[in-house]
């Protein structure tokens, strides 16, 4: 069921659509609402909201859990190719695109008169170019790699919605990684895990399977309120005809001025010296090496410097392990948490439900997410001591013996 959230403010000027991952819609909506978005509507893998141009700039620069932000510019019904062409021709693309600018078209169609999405894009391209030729006696050029504006076309049946992409390159590309681990967690998803976990930057955070340290880096940026796009060079809206550079500089300066201190530490470790070396280089360039402490270490040897602490890990999913090895691996993770992280909270994301049956701990919460195409669950575990710990341990022993041989 869709949820609508309202803020009583001055009437907003423009509707926007923020695209995100399944399961992150609520935290993306919270981020946008805190920035001043109004009429926030949670959709499937997206959030609709209203705001002015300053909010559009700020959302692109600061939102951690958004992949891209679209500005709808037209919607219409059609029953033929000719009608589709005429409706696209009417759209005032010149408000956003210079006559000598560049553009590209992306189409998604379902149950449509079009045989394929490429034909819809081609027809829309012709309509746009013909409009410019009629108005200016010239036409913009197609650039599929680095266009000034990227036009998104959504066709369902006889309905068409058209939007332009204000983000340019996907917002998960923060600009802080010089090298990327082949299986690195998406930055937007990593930030989403941090926000979903409920960590308030009021204690240490630990990722003892950090790989390229995406979770520690995103946690550190959140902890000091560093804008998610702090290291990006540009955004799509900067190439629009109505781009306001002074407004952008104001938005950027105001956001940068909110960067604060973090009195705790974020620890990341991994058994791969190569991953840690690359992560250290990125973190040093970001000037976060006073916050993020990295080490080459097996997870069995990790102990928190102080408790309580928060743990967020993305363990191996077991593609290259047999079932017995994987079950023992997950059992060992659970044992480390029980023995070394009393009074702490741990979160684990994995698609492997069978392996989690051997974890030896009962989750207090589960959140369904996707990591790329993999359907995952984000499990919350709370570690206790004393009578409550003993009670849980007894239950966990029965739980483990039932599922693990």
Residue ranges and their predicted role:
Residues 110-113, 169-170, 316-320:
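A short, flexible beta-alpha/helix-coil linker loop
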Residues 298-403:
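C-terminal catalytic and target-recognition region of SAM-dependent MTase-like enzymes
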Residues 20, 270, 350:
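Short beta-strand/turn micro-motifs composed of small residues
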Residues 185-304, 319, 327:
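Conserved S-adenosyl-L-methionine
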Residues 5-147, 400-405:
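Non-catalytic nucleic-acid substrate-recognition regions in nucleic-acid-modifying enzymes
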Residues 108, 154-196:
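Class I S-adenosyl-L-methionine
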Residues 58, 63, 169-174, 178, ...:
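Flexible, glycine-/basic-rich loop-and-beta segments that form/coincide
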């Amino acid at each position: 069921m869709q949820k609508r959230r309202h803020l009583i403010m001055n009437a907003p000027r423009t509707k926007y659509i923020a695209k995100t991952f399944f399961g992150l819609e609520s935290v993306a909506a919270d981020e946008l609402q805190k920035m001043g978005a109004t009429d926030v509507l949670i959709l499937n893998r997206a959030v609709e909201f209203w705001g002015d141009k300053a909010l559009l700039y700020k959302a692109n620069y600061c939102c951690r859990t958004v992949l891209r932000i679209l500005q709808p510019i037209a919607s219409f019904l059609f029953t033929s190719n000719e009608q589709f062409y005429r409706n696209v021709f009417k759209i005032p693309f010149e408000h956003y695109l210079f006559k000598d600018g560049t553009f590209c078209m992306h189409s998604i169609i379902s149950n449509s008169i079009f045989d394929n999405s490429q034909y819809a894009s081609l027809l829309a391209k012709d309509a746009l170019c013909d409009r410019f030729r009629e108005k200016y006696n010239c036409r913009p050029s197609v650039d599929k790699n680095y266009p000034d504006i990227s036009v998104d076309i959504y066709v369902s049946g006889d309905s068409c919605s058209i939007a332009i992409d204000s983000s340019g390159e996907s917002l998960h590309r923060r600009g802080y990684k010089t090298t990327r681990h082949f299986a690195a967690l998406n930055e937007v998803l990593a930030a989403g895990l941090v926000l979903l976990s409920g960590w308030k930057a009021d204690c240490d955070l630990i990722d003892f399977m950090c790989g390229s340290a995406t979770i520690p880096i995103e946690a550190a940026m959140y902890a000091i309120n560093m804008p998610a796009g702090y290291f990006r060079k540009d955004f799509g809206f900067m190439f629009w005809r109505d781009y306001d550079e002074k407004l952008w500089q104001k938005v950027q300066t105001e956001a940068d001025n909110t960067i604060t201190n973090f009195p705790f530490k974020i620890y990341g470790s991994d058994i791969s010296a190569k991953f840690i070396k690359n992560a250290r280089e990125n973190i040093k360039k970001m000037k976060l090496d006073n916050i993020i402490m990295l080490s080459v270490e097996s997870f069995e040897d990790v102990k928190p410097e102080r408790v309580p602490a928060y743990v967020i890990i993305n363990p191996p999913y077991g593609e290259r392990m047999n079932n017995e090895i994987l079950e023992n691996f997950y059992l060992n993770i659970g044992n480390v948490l029980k023995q070394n992280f009393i009074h702490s909270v741990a979160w684990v994301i994995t698609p492997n439900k069978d392996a989690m049956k051997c974890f030896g701990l009962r989750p207090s919460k589960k959140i369904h997410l996707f990591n790329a195409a993999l359907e995952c669950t984000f499990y919350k575990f709370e570690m206790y001591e004393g009578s409550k710990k003993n009670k849980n341990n007894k239950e966990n022993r029965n739980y483990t013996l039932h599922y693990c041989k």
